[in-house]
């Protein structure tokens, strides 16, 4: 039995970046031998075991063969006679098809085992597929795009990009299950440069299949006096990258991605203006989230940001009553944490424009101060003093909040 560290751990070690995942392959062992040594079996489709002490995953060396369309259409072969090179050959990219032996004490020993020249591709900053079997797994399209968001200075090899296009043309991207699409998109959004993920997906044609609502944004013009970058797709990528640069949460980054979807459906005769795009964005986000089974926190923030971002940009023009109505409409009084994320998404929108990434955004501070004031009102005490009439209570609480905001912002009305 020989144990090897494989894949991302070796890649990241060579790149000098923190190792995010550690995967191990065991050559020359049977499932029974693994169990006898205290490993706990957890794999459904093929033998994967958890180490008794570290709980890290160890998989028996295996080969795989495509038997049907889609992500699950594989037949696996695992046995003590499967070699390390055979196991590495089934992997997606050369930079992920390297290994080092692990000593009984758990240390990496010996040279890097690199049968597909992954080290050369690391030096060249190139994503290159290992072999023709790459086309058998459509998830690899999404994985390469996600890696591009993490390693933003890498490019996709021409022959690899051609294979990805062939896969898309053959309908392989259509066979991807919703959960896996969302998983990879979400992980890519949380990388350092999410726009690179979408660039790769566009380049191979996959974005139009998995996120057609986003793909449709490129080529849609905006007013140059508001958007020097003009193209809506370019703007949205700048917004997402700004949110990533600030380290914002996944819900904020997803809201940044989807806030302007409605601009793709603006009638051609009114371009480059986009009156009413907020409502159209909401109507596109709803089915998108249902289709990809997007988590509720991401969906809910995306919807409120899409609907209200235009209003939020204009809050410097609002009086106290309008601000309180805005808080009530966006549920800021009950959900201040979500409202804080809404501010982050809208600030990203304002700064995700060509040459405007450092411009002041006083709207955020105005809203923070106003919200603290509005939430300081004791609605319970007011209700006890008014009586049982629900409408009277609501009106009295609203008026008290307006007065509190007036005082906090020194607004004379």
Swiss-Prot record:
Necessary cofactors: Mg(2+); Ni(2+)
UniProt: ATP binding residues: 8, 11, 91, 143, 146
Catalytic activity: a tRNA precursor + 2 CTP + ATP = a tRNA with a 3' CCA end + 3 diphosphate; a tRNA with a 3' CCA end + 2 CTP + ATP = a tRNA with a 3' CCACCA end + 3 diphosphate
Keyword ATP-binding belongs to the record: yes
Molecular-function GO terms, alphabetical: ATP binding; CCA tRNA nucleotidyltransferase activity; cyclic-nucleotide phosphodiesterase activity; magnesium ion binding; phosphatase activity; tRNA binding
Binding-site residues, CTP: 8, 11, 91, 143, 146
GO BP, sorted A to Z: RNA repair; tRNA 3'-terminal CCA addition
Segment forming the signal sequence: none
A matching Pfam family: PolyA_pol_RNAbd
Additional note from the record: A single active site specifically recognizes both ATP and CTP and is responsible for their addition.
Domain notes: Comprises two domains: an N-terminal domain containing the nucleotidyltransferase activity and a C-terminal HD domain associated with both phosphodiesterase and phosphatase activities.
Protein name: Multifunctional CCA protein
């Amino acid at each position: 039995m020989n144990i090897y560290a494989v894949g991302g751990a070796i890649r990241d070690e060579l790149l000098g970046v923190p190792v995010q995942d550690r995967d191990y392959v065991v050559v020359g062992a049977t499932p029974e031998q693994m169990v006898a040594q205290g490993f706990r079996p957890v794999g459904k489709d093929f033998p994967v075991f958890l180490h008794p002490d570290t709980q890290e995953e160890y998989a028996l060396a295996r080969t795989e063969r495509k038997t049907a369309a889609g992500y699950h259409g594989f037949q696996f072969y695992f046995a003590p006679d499967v070699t390390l090179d055979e196991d590495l050959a089934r992997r997606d990219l050369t930079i992920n098809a390297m290994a080092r032996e692990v000593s009984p004490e758990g240390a990496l020993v010996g040279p890097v085992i690199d049968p597909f020249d992954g080290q050369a591709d690391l030096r060249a900053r190139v994503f290159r597929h290992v072999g023709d079997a790459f086309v058998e797994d459509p998830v690899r399209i999404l994985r390469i795009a996600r890696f591009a968001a993490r390693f933003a200075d890498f490019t996709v090899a021409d022959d690899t990009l051609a294979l990805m296009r062939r896969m898309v043309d053959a309908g392989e991207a259509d066979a991807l299950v919703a959960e896996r699409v969302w998983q990879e998109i979400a992980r890519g959004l949380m990388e350092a440069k999410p726009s690179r993920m979408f660039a790769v997906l566009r380049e191979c044609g996959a974005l139009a299949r998995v996120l057609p609502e986003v793909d449709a944004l490129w080529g849609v013009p905006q007013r140059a006096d508001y958007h020097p970058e003009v193209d809506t797709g370019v703007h949205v990528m700048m917004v997402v990258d700004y949110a990533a640069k600030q380290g914002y949460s996944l819900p904020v980054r997803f809201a940044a991605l989807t806030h302007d979807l409605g601009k793709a459906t603006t009638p051609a005769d009114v371009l480059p203006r986009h009156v009413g795009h907020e409502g159209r964005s909401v109507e596109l986000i709803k089915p998108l989230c249902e289709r990809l089974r997007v988590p509720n926190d991401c969906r809910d923030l995306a919807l409120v940001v899409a609907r209200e971002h235009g209003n939020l940009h204009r809050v410097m023009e609002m009086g106290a009553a309008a601000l309180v109505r805005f808080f009530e409409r966006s549920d800021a009084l009950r959900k201040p944490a979500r409202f804080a994320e809404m501010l982050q998404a809208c600030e990203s929108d304002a700064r995700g424009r060509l040459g405007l990434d450092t411009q002041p955004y006083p709207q955020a501070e105005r809203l923070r101060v106003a919200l603290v004031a509005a939430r300081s009102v004791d609605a319970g005490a007011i209700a006890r003093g008014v009586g049982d009439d629900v409408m009277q209570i609501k009106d009295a609480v609203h008026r008290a909040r307006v007065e509190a905001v007036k005082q906090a912002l020194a607004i004379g009305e």
